[in-house]
Amino acid sequence: MTLSPLQVLLYKYIMSTFLSNLFARKKLLWPGMTDVHTHLLPGVDDGFSSEKDSLAMLAFLEGQGVERIFLTPHIMADLAKNRKDYLRDRFETFREDCAHIHIDLHLAAEYMLDECFYERMEEGLLSYDGKHVLVEVSCLQAPGDLFEKLYDIQLNGFVPVFAHPERY
């Protein structure tokens, strides 16, 4: 079977369009996004345990258009090592290892409103912008002084932001 010049032209057009769409850069999933709650700081809580896995996730997120990420490790009585200075040191070391990834990384924290919270607040809170603080409570039972703690957070110049509101 011989193709006419018009059929050849149409075939070439269809194939070139198909191939260019097949190999074209896909649309970004989250262009310009800021993620305000992650557990990407390796080895400090229930997030990634290895730096390799954290770096792989950051590379994936970069490829999807994410531009800024707040690393928000848990700070709670059950994780005594997770103090502000310790987390800052871990973050700075990790950020140096992320130099090849073009995402603006920041450190904040996810604070459990437990018996150690007031002590943590006296040390200074790791917040998003000097104003917003990520907090959580047990999904089994809120502390009896929940409203007092939320009020005290505000008296200290912060706006509490609940992590996982769907749990409550």
Q: For the regions a protein language model found, what residue spans apply to each?
A:
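An N-terminally biased module of ancient metal coordination in phosphate/nucleic-acid-related enzymes
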Residues: 9-102
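Extended substrate/RNA-proximal surfaces in nucleic-acid metabolism proteins
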Residues: 82-168
